[in-house]
Amino acid sequence: MINLILLGLPGAGKGTASESIVDKYHLAHISTGDMFREAMANETPVGLEAKSYIDKGNLVPDEVTAKLVEERLKQPDTKNGFILDGFPRTTVQAELLEDITKRLEKPLTNVIAIDVDEDVLIKRLSARYICKKCGATYNKISNPTKVEGTCDRCGGHEFFQREDDKPEVVKNRLEVNKKMNTPLRDFYEEKGILSTVNGEQTPEKVFEDIDKILSKD
């Protein structure tokens, strides 16, 4: 059984890697964002508790998020293993998760960090641009327009960049994430379950390296 967390800064390629892992190993992909939406839509007790914080514009306390994670990990689709997306983000959450996995007898088997140099991440994240006319989104590096300066969808020629995709804003976002990510890595390194892969390779090669780690166990 594989019970896995992927770590990495925004733009490291966690989403793409997650899809490949789920496809091959048939793991339950557990996203905290999806969990919150589902629990609130179904009006479960924990979902309503989370909603009471969100409606006031407050952060949901760690203990409430942990309750949601525990509910989700009890679902039958996690019996072959799971991959956690968006939790834990801090060492406090990591400790709460450890308590949950012990209770449910579903210990984490792997934590894999996808490493990408900060300059590369800034280039990746600030390469996004959007068509003014129809809102189609492109990326200069990974998904440019077929004809330079012309939108594939509507043929428009004017593009803009969102404020939070500008390099200086991206840099700040990465700094905030790095402050949370580093202690988490240290936490799992001490547990002896942390592995790292080079995220500057092609998505196929990144998955190949992850696959080698998961196949070893």
Curated annotation (Swiss-Prot):
One of its GO terms (molecular function) is zinc ion binding. Residues 31-60 are annotated as: NMP. Its EC number is 2.7.4.3. Residues 127-165 are annotated as: LID. PROSITE patterns: ADENYLATE_KINASE. InterPro entries: Adenyl_kin_sub, Adenylat/UMP-CMP_kin, Adenylat_kinase_CS, Adenylate_kinase_lid-dom, P-loop_NTPase. Zn(2+) binds at residues 131, 134, 151, 154. It is found in: Cytoplasm. HAMAP family: Adenylate_kinase_Adk. This is Adenylate kinase. It comes from Lactobacillus johnsonii (strain CNCM I-12250 / La1 / NCC 533). The gene is adk.
